[in-house]
Regions:
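Residue-level signature of outer-membrane beta-barrel architecture
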Residues: 65, 78, 104-108, 160-163, ...
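Outer membrane beta-barrel
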Residues: 91-241, 351-356, 363-393
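Outer membrane beta-barrel transmembrane domains
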Residues: 252-257, 267-269, 286-316, 328, ...
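Outer-membrane beta-barrel "beta-signal"
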Residues: 448-460
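Short loop/turn motifs that connect adjacent beta-strands in outer-membrane beta-barrel proteins
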Residues: 56-72, 105-117, 164-167, 228, ...
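Transmembrane beta-strands of outer-membrane beta-barrel proteins
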Residues: 70-76, 113-120, 168-173, 227, ...
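N-terminal periplasmic/intermembrane-space "pro-region" immediately following the signal or transit peptide
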Residues: 17-79, 83, 89, 107-111
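Outer-membrane beta-barrel pore domains and translocons
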Residues: 77-81, 120-124, 175-177, 236-238, ...
């Protein structure tokens, strides 16, 4: 999900969010003199999300706009979750989001070759069941929070330029790291925030690895080396006020007073299409460096007199992500049995999230009568910083409050998720969910929790 409004409202807005990572494009065409909508022109790649619309073509309005390069999307999501056992407290909550995206292909609209603009706005409401659980490591609803107490919140607004027959792609403006790095359209087949968008250890482990629904000032360049490989890098503002109402999340505010450095990610990807069945895969390896100096957890530990203690350090991140279709069951890139796995690492001296491992599978098209229904299975494992754990152990011994907002010593947490996505109608999906959280908040003093729920998504 992602993009911006640049002219008149119907002219420029394209809203997408981390969950929608499919791509499509804009069309450019001519109106007929008969009052009959012209057929849509095939869109160029990566301009707008390719989705179904509940309201259809709106009497030809949508097709006419897209033929001029204007792509609009209104999207609503509700995530309901209730922990039926375990956690600190039982209860049920709903987290909700309405998103508007506008993507404009300026080549079709004004003849500017390769230029597109993207804007996204959201409104979020509701409450997270993980607050009842007492868990902030892997929230059971990914759609909650970070959008400010406002009616309309700007997520991103940026321009994108493709050159050299789309082998070179440059983007700049208000955007987040998650939009282009360490992410996949497959990840939001799951409701738990451990994976939806990108692996939680990356944005939670470093503010520089910014994520939806907030953007920062940034520039990014991607070079497609061969048809199935690319390398990309960028420079992103690191804002210590990110996700907070005071500095960042209020409406259209982009307060830079809390800037502390820059975040520089680099990612290499290999995207094969194997065999006669074109079994699609994505293999990514990435690295991120945050120039901010963070206070080391070591500085809070008791040390031997005269022994030097490292007080500050930069954070570095590393990730390896893989997904591969094993059996094809339809024409689309996600129509089949797909295995996925990943690993992410932070500097545990300055980041509470040390490492994350996940493995999962998605099965779409297994039922010929319902080709868009999807089964998802995911197992996620997060380890917390051992240095942070040592600090928390000392705090427990002296009866002090725990660091990191914890209520006990944090070590590791595991989450198992299973779901079944039912395609109800065009643009409408309903997904019953089951999640089991082992050691909520990575603590032994919070009971394992069983969570039942569902996710509803409507694309208008």
């Amino acid at each position: 999900m992602r993009r911006l409004v640049a002219l008149a409202l119907p002219l420029c807005i394209a809203v997408a969010w981390p969950a929608s990572a499919q791509t499509t494009d804009c069309s450019g065409g001519v109106n007929t003199s008969l009052g009959v909508s012209p057929p849509p022109v095939p869109p160029p790649a990566h301009v707008a999300p390719e989705v179904e619309h509940l309201l259809g073509d709106l009497g030809g309005i949508r097709t006419n706009l897209e033929n001029q390069g204007i792509y609009l999307l209104l999207d609503a999501t509700a995530e309901f979750a209730g922990n039926v056992s375990g956690g600190n407290k039982q209860g049920a909550t709903s987290a909700n989001q309405v998103a508007f995206e506008a993507d404009i292909d300026w080549q079709r609209l004004a003849g500017v070759t390769g230029l597109s603009t993207h804007v996204i706005f959201v409104n979020r409401s509701g409450y997270s069941d993980s607050i009842l659980l007492g868990d902030s490591v892997a929230p059971v609803q990914e759609i909650y929070g970070a959008s400010g107490n406002v009616l309309v919140h700007l997520v991103s607004a940026y321009a994108e330029l493709t050159l050299l027959d789309q082998r070179l792609d440059i983007a700049a403006g208000q955007m987040n790291v998650e939009n282009d790095f360490a992410s996949s359209p497959l990840y939001c087949n799951f409701m738990n925030n451990a994976l939806c968008g990108d692996p939680k250890a990356l944005p939670a482990g470093d503010l520089g690895h910014s994520a939806f629904p907030d953007g920062v000032w940034a520039g990014r360049i991607r070079v497609r080396l061969t048809p199935d490989t690319y390398v990309e890098t960028g420079v992103y503002e690191v804002n210590q006020g990110l996700y907070t109402n005071q500095y960042f999340s209020t409406g259209f505010q982009t307060n830079m007073s809390q800037d502390s450095g820059v975040y520089v990610p680099v990612e290499f990807a290999y995207e094969p299409s194997i065999g006669a069945d074109r079994l699609v895969g994505h293999y990514k390896i990435g690295f991120g460096y945050d120039s901010t100096l963070y206070k080391s957890f070591y500085s809070a530990l008791a040390t031997v007199p005269g022994q030097p203690t490292p007080n500050k350090s930069h954070n570095m991140q590393f990730w390896v992500l893989v997904d591969q279709m094993l059996i094809r069951q339809g024409a689309g890139d996600q129509d089949g049995i797909i295995a996925l796995a990943g690993f992410a690492h932070n500097n545990p001296n300055v980041s509470a999230f040390a490492e994350q491992y996940f493995v999962g599978a998605i099965d779409r098209g297994f039922w010929r009568a319902r080709p868009q229904d999807t089964i998802g299975l995911l197992f996620n494992y997060n380890t917390m910083s051992g240095t942070l754990g040592a600090v928390q152990t000392e705090q427990a011994e002296f009866g002090l409050p725990f660091s990191n907002g914890a209520t006990g010593v944090q070590t590791h947490e595991m989450v198992l998720e299973a779901n079944y996505s039912i395609h109800v109608y065009r643009g409408v999906d309903f997904r019953p969910e089951f999640e089991y959280v082992f050691r909520p908040n990575a603590q032994t003093n919070i009971r394992n929790a069983a969570v039942l729920g569902f996710k509803v998504n409507v694309q208008f």
